[in-house]
Amino acid sequence: MEDVKLQFPSLPLCKEEAEDWAYPMRREMQEILPGLFLGPYSAAMKSKLSVFQKCGITHVICIRQNIEANFIKPNFQQLFRYLVLDIADNPVENIIRFFPMSKEFIDGCLQTGGKVLIHGNAGISRSAALVIAYIMETFGIKYRDAFTYVQERRFCINPNAGFVHQLQEYEAIYLAKLTIKMMSPLQLGRPLCIQSGATGSLKRTLDDEDELGNMQVSAAHEG
């Protein structure tokens, strides 16, 4: 059996003097990671341009349903780079399919020194789920740990039950995907054991590449 151990960076530590949460803060955006902000649409309205500029925002992920398009709009497309996603805040919505493109967009922003805001309508469920998934995959941690990390910075987050289930399933998916990337063609023909680094604990034995692929497809259609 081949052991493939994945290494992940450490999560940035909490600020020593974290600001006490107050109810009006739910209408503002909070910085979750250096350069990554989470908030509601009220933080991305036209009247907030000066706040965007003060915070150094360069990229925005705007999450909405088609029926919300009349009031949730990418207001600064001439000034910032946008990724607009059509996601319903519904437990049966397949949100996993949006995780890879969101991660690519966020990574592209942060790696070039930019700053990104992820927002939906309230900044509580859909956008929070994308941020949690990003932290899970980037730092190799479980859903509960990623949720706690985000909630310490934006207390009001509350992904719906279907999103929570998919986030819990996503750990196996991203670990399998990263492991396949690291493996040689010879290793792909052998049984393998996937281990996350010190920050994760998932250990999954798989027979071959086909089983990995099937696992990803089936998990992505749950919830």
Swiss-Prot record:
CC terms in the record's Gene Ontology section: cytoplasm; nucleoplasm
GO biological process, one term: negative regulation of SCF-dependent proteasomal ubiquitin-dependent catabolic process
A Pfam family that the UniProt record links to this protein: DSPc
Listed SUPFAM superfamilies: (Phosphotyrosine protein) phosphatases II (SSF52799)
All residue ranges annotated as the Tyrosine-protein phosphatase domain in the record: 28-176
Organism domain of life: Eukaryota
Gene Ontology MF annotations: F-box domain binding
Database matches in InterPro entries: Dual-sp_phosphatase_cat-dom, Prot-tyrosine_phosphatase-like, STYX-Interacting_Phosphatase, Tyr_Pase_dom, TYR_PHOSPHATASE_DUAL_dom
Record's function text: Catalytically inactive phosphatase.
Family (UniProt): Belongs to the protein-tyrosine phosphatase family. Non-receptor class subfamily.
PANTHER family: SERINE/THREONINE/TYROSINE-INTERACTING PROTEIN (PTHR46588), SERINE_THREONINE_TYROSINE-INTERACTING PROTEIN (PTHR46588:SF1)
Protein name: Serine/threonine/tyrosine-interacting protein A
Organism of this sequence: Xenopus laevis (African clawed frog)
Taxonomic placement: Eukaryota, Metazoa, Chordata, Craniata, Vertebrata
Gene expressing this chain: styx-a
